[in-house]
Amino acid sequence: MKNKRSQNSPYVTPNNPYLTLEKALGYSFKDKRLLEQALTHKSCKLALNNERLEFLGDAVLGLVIGELLYHKFYQYDEGKLSKLRASIVSAHGFTKLAKAIALQDYLRVSSSEEISNGREKPSILSSAFEALMAGVYLEAGLAKVRKIIQNLLNRAYKRLDLEHLFMDYKTALQELTQAQFCVIPTYQLLQEKGPDHHKEFEMALYIQDKMYATAKGKSKKEAEQQCAYQALQKLKEAK
């Protein structure tokens, strides 16, 4: 079992090896065992790992982020709010928030995961972030989680709006497929129709020669982003 912060690190104190993490988070755990559980991946083969906390954290974060978006984007309809939430409540979105507090440096993973750079994997890092937020919820309640998430969103995203996040789907998918399959997705133009001033493009997305999505858009780029969004949802459901 490995923890990246060595005892010689300036970030480690004898009484609290997680002091810097808690400062970045803006919350100090009363029960450090709960914090350690949230940071412990199942690969460690310990009696307590973060899987149960991850389950709770997923529900807590879905509610908190949904509420924040509901109040912030009063002009968005249900469809736009759902797309916006899906881009944040995802492995890519939670990994982005986790890296804002350098959570990867504190994960407890097995030696084999350490060798394969497991602490940087979106699946492991995002799950640990969900577990961490569940721990905060259990100790301090929903209001504290809400405050932490609001702060992290402001730090992790220069612009929190549908257009900006939507344009990040291709990047998110590429990072995920490289981590899971060691390949990047490919896009193919299926159809182009309409006059020059009103073109419509239909694109297909493939991962390892398997078609994952098709979508239409006013440009190839827009259609590719739609494809990437669909593929991300399929991979999330298959997790």
Swiss-Prot record:
Database matches in PANTHER family: RIBONUCLEASE 3, RIBONUCLEASE III
Family: Belongs to the ribonuclease III family.
PROSITE patterns on file: DS_RBD, RNASE_3_1, RNASE_3_2
Keywords tagged on the record: Cytoplasm, Endonuclease, Hydrolase, Magnesium, Metal-binding, mRNA processing, Nuclease, RNA-binding, rRNA processing, rRNA-binding, tRNA processing
Cofactor needs: Mg(2+)
Keyword Nuclease listed: yes
Domain DRBM stretches: 168-237
Naturally occurring in which organism (per UniProt): Helicobacter pylori (strain P12)
GO biological process: mRNA processing; regulation of gene expression; rRNA processing; tRNA processing
Active site: 58, 130
Subunit description: Homodimer.
Reported function: Digests double-stranded RNA. Involved in the processing of primary rRNA transcript to yield the immediate precursors to the large and small rRNAs (23S and 16S). Processes some mRNAs, and tRNAs when they are encoded in the rRNA operon. Processes pre-crRNA and tracrRNA of type II CRISPR loci if present in the organism.
Enzyme Commission number(s): 3.1.26.3
Gene Ontology CC: cytoplasm
Gene3D superfamilies (alphabetical): 3.30.160.20, Ribonuclease III domain (1.10.1520.10)
Keyword rRNA processing: yes
Binding site for Mg(2+): 54, 127, 130
SMART domains the record matches: DSRM, RIBOc
Main location: cytoplasm
Subcellular location: Cytoplasm
Name of the protein in question: Ribonuclease 3
Catalytic activity: Endonucleolytic cleavage to 5'-phosphomonoester
Domain of life: Bacteria
